[in-house]
Amino acid sequence: MVCGVALTFAAWPAFAANSLPVDAIVLGKTDLDRGYADMYNLQFAQAHAEFTAWMQTNPNDPMGPVSDAAAYLFTEFARLNVLDVDLFDDDNHFESRGKRTTDPAVKAAFQRDLEQADRLATLALTHAPQDANALFARTLVNGLHADYAQMIEGRDFAGLHYTRLASKDAERLLTIAPHMDDAYLAVGLENYILGLKPAPVRWLLALTGAETNAALGKRDMELTASQGHYLAPFARLLLAVAALRDKKNDRARQILASLAAEFPNNPLYARQLAKIR
């Protein structure tokens, strides 16, 4: 998630800096896999249909409604051009972004899905406190809340609150299931985004318990990008942003080109690719 979805560092597997996957979820077999592939391709009606099919056959799985909520969030991101790399490459652009005009119907559906997912995840964790699937779903719930608060409504402090909740669940999840590489994005984003703040701000954020190490955050994002599942394409986009901030334009081009090839119906990647000099 843009600022909401950022852990602990165990044994890091070695991988080449340019070995990002090009078929992370497109070849998936389940309705959830197909739904995420459709979402990243901006085919939102198909994504909702796949997620609805999953919810019908798996009514107690919180991953159904939270994934459907993600499709609603990406609908708003696409409508409002939230995922424009220029917004994140320039601090002044980001700080002056302001509140955006929301779609009330999309917001209502988004919140309804998140409430359902949170309810199912909490119920599952009541019966099985180490339910990895429920913890991951709740990590996504709070990450999506953070994204909406920060990127749509311009409420940074509310977003930080949800980011911390997402990060805590992700840390707990990774102690139980360290192979769930998607979860590293939650902690990595918190570390990376907040680590870019000026030193006095980082110090104050650290007092609140926020993780503020940009270098470690980037390593977490790289792990999700290279070995994640549902969130790998999103992590790759964020790494492209990080590369641009580091003036590594060739690296950004490589990542965006692979995303454009993988998701040809999404014009975002090609559009951003054309902007890189």
Question: Which residue stretches match the model-derived regions?
Answer:
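Flexible, glycine-rich surface segments
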Residues: 219-238, 242-255
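A cross-kingdom marker for long, charged
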Residues: 241-277
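Residue-level recognition of tetratricopeptide repeat
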Residues: 61-62, 131, 180, 231-232, ...
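Sec/Tat signal peptide C-region and signal peptidase I cleavage site
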Residues: 12-16
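Canonical tetratricopeptide repeat
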Residues: 67-68, 137, 186, 238, ...
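Bacterial N-terminal signal peptides
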Residues: 1-11
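Short coil/linker segments at helix-helix boundaries
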Residues: 17-34, 38-50, 60, 71-130, ...
